[in-house]
Amino acid sequence: MLYRSLIALIAFLAMVPAAMAAEWEEGTHYRTLSEPVETRSGDQLELAEVFWYGCPSCYSMQPVIEEWKETKPDDVNLRHVPASLRRDWAPHAKAFYAARQLGVVDGIHSELFDALAGERRDLNDVDAIAAFFEEQGVAEASEVRDAWGSFAVDTAMRRGRQFQQGAKVTGTPTLVVEGKYVISVRAAGSYENMLAIADHLLEKERSGD
């Protein structure tokens, strides 16, 4: 009896992913853009994460994102798009692009989340952010200031705003799949669901459905 119960349980669990995928409904769990936004991942499929370093929900989502990255398909690129939906978010978006310009995103990304969302540190201008980079040992303050004022970072900020406007992003965290599908945590119900829906939509793009 116990053996049959275990077999039934295993069979049920094996069916769960397919059942869940069938439940992801357009207009309920995600929305489709009438005009897709530009992707920047070349031949790879793109999953864009729109985030703000000061966002508690984005901060809570990071462990889920990191776990997902460990088994991320090779044909998918995770693109980080720092939100600048409000004027006071702009310095934090610029901090990300300055870090990318300096090649130190991996060394500062989590630390910026910890400082801004976790500790609520006052890092709201170039001097404070440059000092923070130096404090973390990833770049000299002068290097951060140079990157901050560069044409490349200004261009990245402009493209990031265009992406957010085109995708009609109104809050963070938000996922955008292949420039076509937008997933919010409110619609998805959880961070885990956001990524499950993203995986479902990425597979939809692979199959051409």
Question: Which residues does each predicted region cover?
Answer:
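Short, contiguous strand/loop micro-motifs
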Residues: 52, 82-83, 116-117, 147-148, ...
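A short alpha-helix capping/helix-coil boundary motif
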Residues: 45-46, 73-76, 107-111, 138-141, ...
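Solvent-exposed, acidic/flexible segments
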Residues: 43-44, 54-61, 85-92, 101-105, ...
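Structural microenvironment flanking redox-active thiols in thiol-disulfide oxidoreductases
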Residues: 73-102, 107-133
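Extracytoplasmic thiol/disulfide redox context detector
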Residues: 2-87, 161, 166, 202-209
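Sec/Tat-exported extracytoplasmic proteins
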Residues: 54, 69-72, 99-103, 112, ...
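C-terminal cap of thioredoxin/glutaredoxin-like
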Residues: 135-209
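Extracytoplasmic/secreted envelope proteins and their assembly/folding machinery
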Residues: 62-69, 92-96, 109, 126, ...
